[in-house]
């Protein structure tokens, strides 16, 4: 991929709005079933403010807010992605653009991070998680939503996805233990894993 897109896939999308819009639309379509499973499996009602970090067009955050009438949300993504989502802004949903490697993230009671960390290598993933940890109040929860590689050595879709993420972005799908190690390096502790029937919610807290 480096030979095809030397500057990296995400900077390339930032310069190609039509392709970026197509990609974001595809992500919304792909995640439809996953989002429904997440909102059915997890109780978001304890949270007042919910941040969606790298949340694209906000499909997950919108569904969570619909299921949690008392909550407000902050959608954080790159400027060109947030520009596509301008119509989502409301009294309950705030838009914030930036770079999670450089810019301050919002202070929230819970942080949704859905299929973001698998885009990055371990060092980059820890940097993203540390940025969240820096912004997170002591009582906050991190809700990382990813396809886990199971301990079973047999065939599994996540292993195919692992190869795809490595070839496209230098990223990785990971096991529960590997995510726990990333959390520890970033100042979080894994509390539990909620299986939604496919994708998993890894709940972590600041330490």
Q: Model regions: which residues?
A:
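Conserved Class I S-adenosyl-L-methionine-dependent methyltransferase catalytic core
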Residues: 1-49
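Alpha-helical subdomain
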Residues: 39-40, 44-207
């Amino acid at each position: 991929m480096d030979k095809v897109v030397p500057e990296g896939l995400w900077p390339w999308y930032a310069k190609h709005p039509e392709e970026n819009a197509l990609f974001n639309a595809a992500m919304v379509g792909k995640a439809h079933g996953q989002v429904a499973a997440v909102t059915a499996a997890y109780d978001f009602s304890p949270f007042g403010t919910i941040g969606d970090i790298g949340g694209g067009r906000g499909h997950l955050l919108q569904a969570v807010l619909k299921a949690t009438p008392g909550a407000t949300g902050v959608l954080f993504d790159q400027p060109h992605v947030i520009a596509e989502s301008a119509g989502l802004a409301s009294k309950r949903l705030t838009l914030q653009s930036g770079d999670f490697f450089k810019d301050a993230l919002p202070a929230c009671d819970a942080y949704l991070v859905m299929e973001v960390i698998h885009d990055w290598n371990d060092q980059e993933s820890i940097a993203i998680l540390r940025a969240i940890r820096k912004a997170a109040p002591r009582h906050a929860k991190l809700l990382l939503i990813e396809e886990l590689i199971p301990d079973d050595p047999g065939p599994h879709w996540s292993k195919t996805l692992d190869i795809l993420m490595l070839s496209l972005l230098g990223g990785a799908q990971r096991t529960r233990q590997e995510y726990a190690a990333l959390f520890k390096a970033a100042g979080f502790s894994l509390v539990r894993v909620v299986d939604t029937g496919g994708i998993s919610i890894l709940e972590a807290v600041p330490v």
